[in-house]
Amino acid sequence: MRSSLLTLPKSFLGFMPLYLAVEIVLGISILNKCSGAYGILALFTGHPLDFMQWIAYLWSVFTLIVFSQGLYLIHKPNLLVFSQICVLYTIDTISTCFFTLWFTTQWFTLEDTANIDGNNALQSNPISTGKLTERGIDISKQSATESYEYTMTILITLVSLIFRFYFNFILASFVQELLHHPKYLVDRDDVEQNLKNKPIWKRLWAKSQKGCYKLCKNLLE
C-alpha cells in the first residue's frame, strides 16, 4: 500500500473522533447552505438576482442535498457517498473563496461609490460654513467607522476560510480512514451490475460517485 500524498489530522482539534467531527462539519455546512435555498425564494418576492448570485444559490441548493445525504449516513458510512462529499466539499471550498472575493469586491465598490456620491453632493450644496464643518466632522467619523468595518470584515473572512480548509482536511481524513478499512471497500463490478436497470439520472449520479471515489483513492490511499 503506497503512502498518502497528504498528512491529515486523525482527530478534530486533537481530541474529538473523526466521525463526530464530520457530523459537526456537515451540520455547519448544511446550515450555511440553507441560505442558498432562502436566496432562491427571492424569485417569489420579485427581488432581482444577478448571474453570480444565481450560480451561488443554485450551487448551495445542490450541495445542501449532497451534504444532507452524508449527515444521514454518518453512522453507516458509504465510501462512494463520502468520496463524493469530500470532492464536492473541496470544490465548494474553492468556489467559496471565489465568491467571497467577488461579493466582497462588489460590496467595497458600492460603498466607495456611495461615499464619492455623498462627498460630491456635499460640495455642490449651497449650505452655510457651520453646517459644512459639522458635516465634515461627521464624514471623518464615518470614514473611521468604515475602515474598522472593512478590517473586521476581512479578519472574519480570513478566519472563516482557515476553518473551512481545516474542515476540508477533516473530511479527507475521514474518507482516508474508510479507504483503509476493508469493511467499506467498494466492489465496482457490483455497482455496475446494480445500475443496469436504473434510470439515467441514477446512473449518472453513480458515475459521479465512482469518479470521486477513484480520485480520493488515488490521492488519499
From Swiss-Prot:
Primary localisation category: Golgi
Chain segments annotated as transmembrane: 11-31, 54-74, 79-99, 154-174
Superkingdom of the source species: Eukaryota
This protein's record includes keyword Cytoplasm: no
Subcellular localization, as worded in the UniProt entry: Golgi apparatus membrane
Effect of residue 135 to S: Impairs cleavage by KEX2
Record carries keyword Membrane: yes
Segments for region (COPI vesicle-binding): 176-221
GO molecular function term, any single one: inositol phosphoceramide synthase regulator activity
Keywords linked to the UniProt accession: Golgi apparatus, Lipid metabolism, Membrane, Sphingolipid metabolism, Transmembrane, Transmembrane helix
Reported function: Regulatory component of the inositol phosphorylceramide (ICP) synthase which catalyzes the addition of a phosphorylinositol group onto ceramide to form inositol phosphorylceramide, an essential step in sphingolipid biosynthesis. Helps the medial Golgi localization of IPC synthase in a COPI vesicle-dependent manner.
Protein name, as recorded: Inositol phosphorylceramide synthase regulatory subunit KEI1
Organism per entry: Saccharomyces cerevisiae (strain ATCC 204508 / S288c)
Organism lineage string: Eukaryota, Fungi, Dikarya, Ascomycota, Saccharomycotina
Gene symbol of the encoding locus: KEI1
